[in-house]
Amino acid sequence: KKFINNQNFKISDFSNHSHLDYKNIDAQSTGFKNNSFDFIISSNMIHHLPYPLKFFEEMHRILKNKGKLIIFDAHCSVLLQSILILMRHEGFDFTKNVWNSKEPATDINDLWSGNSAIPYLIFNDEKKFNYYLGSKFKIKYKKLCECTLFLNSGGVTSKTFYIPMNFFF
């Protein structure tokens, strides 16, 4: 919020942090009125969604006509997969069907768990994306970014062994 100076800019999350305008919001069922937003930005959260299709349906419902949904999330490259294995953080499962609204793609009992394969499964096959969502959304721009951006985004915790450097200094 300190970088975007606009009174209409609001921040939400599935948490109760004091800096949030909307707290404990389930992105698959927000409770917002229809046609409420011109823009929605989804930052590194798609991979946490048990039912991605429900998310897109909800975003379509709450976006105004000609509204824009901007999504950025990790690309589950071989490098990211290796790092996730080493860190024992979240995980990836390419066998999940992200288009099934009955079978979860992540652990529904732990919304902080993640399946880092979800963005790949949604956006890599544009024919499938268009089949399921083409009447509501179009992919206008897609770019792969270095996975360390995701790892340094602030939401990653590691269970990897490390030696605190301040111990030596």
Where on the chain are the PLM-derived regions?
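Conserved class I S-adenosyl-L-methionine
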Residues: 69-106
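Acceptor-substrate binding/catalytic loop of class I
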Residues: 108-127
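A C-terminal cap/extension of S-adenosyl-L-methionine-dependent methyltransferases
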Residues: 127-136, 140-169
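Class I SAM-dependent methyltransferase SAM/SAH-binding core
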Residues: 1-30, 54
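Short catalytic micro-motifs in class I SAM-dependent methyltransferases
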Residues: 44-48
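A short glycine-rich, Lys/Arg-flanked "PGG" loop and its adjoining helix->strand segment in the class I
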Residues: 53-68
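A conserved beta-strand element that flanks and buttresses the S-adenosyl-L-methionine
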Residues: 41
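Short N-terminal helix/helix-N-cap motif within the alpha/beta-hydrolase-1
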Residues: 50-54, 79
